[in-house]
Curated annotation (Swiss-Prot):
Belongs to the protein N5-glutamine methyltransferase family. PrmC subfamily. This is Release factor glutamine methyltransferase. Methylates the class 1 translation termination release factors RF1/PrfA and RF2/PrfB on the glutamine residue of the universally conserved GGQ motif. InterPro entries: DNA_methylase_N6_adenine_CS, HemK-like, N5-glutamine_MTase, PrmC_N, RF_methyltr_PrmC, SAM-dependent_MTases_sf, Small_mtfrase_dom. Coiled coil: none annotated. It comes from the Bacteria. The keyword Glycoprotein does not apply. The lineage of its organism: Bacteria, Pseudomonadati, Pseudomonadota, Betaproteobacteria, Burkholderiales. Gene3D superfamilies: DNA helicase RuvA subunit, C-terminal domain, Vaccinia Virus protein VP39.
Length: 270
């Protein structure tokens, strides 16, 4: 049988990825792998590892192969039905949590929740909040509901297209969203991890601003007086996003930069 150290030395994969796949297949920690690197690997485990390795070599994201990824300090289960949460999106959550500080029972809406990473992170960071998450995809909502339950977050999940998922009378203190903002002709859709992620979570099949326009335009009708909205967008879309928010009648519209200095989110107040 193949020894563990020989499996991890497979030249096809970076060693870190090889180890992560082994941890996943064997259900063991890194420390265990180091202590048992001369152990033989059961044929079934080796076959499972090699199958995952082949998928990785074909470009499939590690997050899908491992069944999840960490975001804001918590592990989120993921399937190919949902977008993989990026560190960039943590700015949206951090901004939301900062704005919610000191509010007794704020009502928060996450539009297009996907895996639920944003909604669940807000609910965990602000336990007194009433968080609602929407998504057009039933499969995505199932992932979000599973993550909320596993992490003990209080999140109401509703199926539907943006604001159409909501009861007519619902109003919110805060709206957040990381919508599809890649233009349909963008070459990046055929590159890297994006090839494997749900297209509907990446592109609006338009110019990249259609979903942002719907969210901004519908915000005044769904925000409580003094409420806020924050939207994530592309690196070159901040000016356009601000224009959409101003056109909707929101005030004090501005953008915030991520750690790389990119204007990553834009928002305003009712």
């Amino acid at each position: 049988m193949t020894l563990l150290k020989d499996l991890l030395a497979d030249p096809g994969l970076p060693r870190l990825e090889a180890r992560m796949l082994a941890e996943h297949v064997l259900g063991r920690s890194r420390a265990w792998l180091l202590a048992h690197d001369t152990d033989p690997v059961e044929p079934a485990h080796e076959a499972a590892w090699r199958q995952l390795a082949a998928r990785r070599l074909a470009g499939e994201p590690m997050a899908y192969l491992l069944g999840g990824r960490e975001f804001m300090g918590h592990w989120y289960a993921l399937t190919p039905d949902v977008l993989i949460p990026r560190p960039d999106t943590e700015l949206l959550v951090e901004t939301a949590l900062h704005w919610l500080q000191g509010r007794a029972a704020p009502r928060v809406l996450d539009l297009g929740t996907g895996s639920g990473a944003i909604a669940v992170s807000v609910a965990l960071g602000c336990p007194q909040a009433e968080v609602t998450a929407t998504d057009l995809s039933a499969a995505a909502l199932a992932v979000a509901e599973g993550n909320a339950q596993r992490l003990g977050a209080r999140v109401r999940c509703l199926a539907g297209d943006w604001y159409e998922a909501l009861p007519a009378q619902d109003r919110y203190d805060l709206i957040v969203s990381n919508p599809p903002y890649i233009a349909r002709e963008d070459a990046h859709l055929a590159q890297g991890d994006l090839r494997f992620e749900p297209r509907g979570a990446l592109t609006d099949e338009n110019d990249g601003l259609a979903a942002l326009a719907r969210i901004a335009g519908g915000a005044p009708g769904r925000l409580l007086p003094g409420g806020a909205i924050w939207m994530e967008h592309g690196w070159d879309q901040a000016e356009a996003a601000r224009a959409l928010l101003r056109q909707a009648g929101l005030r004090e519209v501005h953008s915030r930069r991520d750690l790389a200095g990119i204007e990553r989110i834009s928002g305003g107040y009712l």
